[in-house]
Amino acid sequence: MRYIVNKLFIKIVILFCVAFIGSCFMLHAQDTFPYPAIPKEIKDADKRLSFLIEHYWDRFDFADTSLLKRNIAEQGLSDFLDILKGADSTTVNDGVKIFVNRFVCSDTASTEAQLVKEYFVGKMEQYLYDYRSPMRNDALYVSYLQTISNSPLTDTFEREHYRYIINNLQKNRLGETATDFAFTDRGGRVRRMSGFKGRDIVLFFYDPDCHSCHSEMEQMINGKSLLNSNIVVLAIYPGAETDRWERGDIFIGKNIQKSLNSKGEGIEFIDGCSIGGEILSKDIYFIRELPSVYIIDKDGRVVLKECTAKDVVSYFQRSPCPALDF
């Protein structure tokens, strides 16, 4: 805990120095992001962090579109999102509201204001929502979307779109019980995911024609960490086109053979197809991209969400895995 506080304090000091130096050399143009200066009287680390977040955007000129082209805005936003990781949820939500109100509640009639809004909306999606972003954070993105969707300056279409994403991102969150569903296996039997409770489940949503699905599955198998009798891989085609799923028998069959040892022992694979494509049509799981991989523990809780093959291998080797929420 002391290490985290000290590290955060050092970052705040660095940001203060950058702000001071930047202000000394800034003439008519803003050449660096204008980080706020934290008053010396504030000694408590948490209060310094709260002040930094609350006043982070005070000196940034949201009307100057040249800052967008020179990447000054992007650097400032990246640092802001990084700083939010060290704050409590209340401070985070307050900071996000201040930020959103600054770029949304400007002169909406001007072309410059619209450019600024589009820029920050795009960057927030890129950093926090994009499937492969190292900064992806569902909880923070939901906080942001809730704020922007509640703005009176957000139109009806945008508001409905944001609320759709909010609703889906709040499904099957880390630590929560994974939503059960029915599927048909290769033998024609109707089964349920809950039937495997008591075992670790690698839930692998795939498409037979998806090259990335092939690659990710092979990486998981080559890692050998799934060679455990208490682990089951549920490879599920979430769509409604059963003819495409039937072609996938070759894909799954090849990978099963690769996973077996000389005694015929290996990973247990269950290959299934969503009944009527309900996983997609009813958004039972929010699948942004395929493959979409979850790890569900013996108690049926989600422990990794939308992870990579590398994350799966690391998890079952009991090595640290990237955190996707906070």
List each language-model region with its residue ranges:
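Structural microenvironment flanking redox-active thiols in thiol-disulfide oxidoreductases
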Residues: H214-L260, G276-S281
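Short active-site neighborhood of thiol/selenol oxidoreductases, capturing the structured segment around
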Residues: R192-M220, V233-L234
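N-terminal targeting or signal-anchor segments and their processing/structural boundaries
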Residues: F25, A29-Y56, A63, L67, ...
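Bacterial Sec-dependent N-terminal signal peptides
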Residues: M1-T32, K305
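Short, internal strand/loop/helix patches
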Residues: D249-Y294, K298
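Thiol-/selenol-based redox modules, centered on thioredoxin-like
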Residues: E289-L290, I295-F326
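Oxidative protein folding and maturation machinery
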Residues: Q30-R186
